[in-house]
């Protein structure tokens, strides 16, 4: 029993150290960006002083505790994927107050699709590369466990708007870019209100609502509901069922429900 308590003590110390480093880093960022124009101002003590340290405390602790599971998934992934078990992709992060542009970071997940190719060397369609192992990974959300590293690095938060593809950035209205004024999240308000079953407009509305109302009680509720939804496997839609955001947005442009951003017109000449 004393060995178990000692291990718990070590985990808490390491998690606390990570939390302190995060707090100091946030204060240094405030000094560095003093005078810069922010799209989003932190509301209250929680968002400004507590949220980021808590992210690091729980993410570091969780990473240590589940390390045996990660090692197992890495081993199985190497076998099932016939190589690299990880999938990384550029995603837009929080807007840099000095440049006014989203910081691009590398999101890391467990690979859920194989790299199988046809006779011409082209990747097979997603539905053919998504095997039963990958489907189970996605359904259980185990593929997202490596994202704890992104949280510790400061790319993301435990709770926040989910980071979409970089290619979608040109399709946001100026108001919708506000979703990137905070760190993206491992889970978010949209994920517990329909997960991938919600359409793109609903997801955007949930994200914007979250950005304007960041509170500890709401974050705790979102985490609880996320865990609950993962275990009951609710609101899960297979990849591709909702289509891509760019196609969805072009449809809205065509019917006039959403104006075409001036930046997109200047960039593409549309």
Model-derived regions: residue spans:
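Feature marks short, surface-exposed loop/turn motifs that line or immediately flank catalytic pockets
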Residues: 114-117, 155
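A hydrophobic, helix-centered structural microdomain
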Residues: 8-115, 222-270
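Cytosol-/stroma-facing membrane-proximal "stalk/adaptor" domains immediately downstream
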Residues: 175-241
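A short, structured surface patch at a secondary-structure boundary
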Residues: 125-183, 223-226
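Membrane-penetrating hydrophobic segments
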Residues: 1-9
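Cytosolic-biased juxtamembrane loops and peripheral soluble domains of multi-pass membrane proteins
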Residues: 30-48, 89-92, 116-136, 162-172, ...
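An acidic site on a long C-lobe helix of protein kinase domains
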Residues: 49-52, 65-68, 129, 141-147, ...
């Amino acid at each position: 029993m004393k060995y178990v308590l000692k291990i718990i003590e070590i985990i808490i110390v390491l998690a606390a150290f990570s939390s302190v480093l995060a707090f100091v880093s946030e204060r240094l960022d405030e000094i560095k960006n003093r005078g810069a124009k922010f799209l989003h101002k932190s509301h209250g003590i929680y968002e400004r002083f507590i949220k980021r340290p808590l992210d690091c405390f729980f993410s570091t602790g969780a990473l240590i505790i589940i390390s045996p599971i990660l090692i197992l998934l890495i081993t199985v992934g190497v076998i099932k994927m016939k190589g690299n078990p990880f999938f990384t992709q550029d995603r837009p992060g929080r807007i840099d107050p000095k440049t006014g542009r989203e910081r691009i970071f590398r999101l890391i997940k467990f690979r859920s699709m194989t790299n199988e190719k046809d006779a011409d060397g082209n990747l097979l369609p997603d539905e053919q590369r998504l095997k039963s192992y990958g489907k189970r990974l996605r359904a259980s959300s185990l593929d997202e466990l490596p994202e704890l590293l992104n949280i510790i690095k400061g790319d993301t938060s435990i709770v926040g708007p989910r980071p979409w593809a970089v290619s979608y950035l040109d399709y946001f209205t100026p108001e919708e870019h506000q979703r990137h004024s905070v760190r993206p999240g491992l889970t978010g308000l949209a994920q517990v209100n329909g997960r991938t079953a919600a359409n793109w407009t609903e997801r955007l509305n949930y994200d914007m609502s979250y950005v304007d109302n960041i509170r500890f009680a709401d974050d705790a509720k979102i985490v609880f509901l996320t865990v609950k939804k993962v275990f009951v496997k609710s609101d899960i839609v297979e990849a591709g069922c909702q289509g891509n955001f760019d196609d969805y947005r072009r449809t809205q442009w065509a019917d006039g429900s959403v104006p075409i951003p001036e930046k997109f017109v200047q960039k593409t000449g549309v």
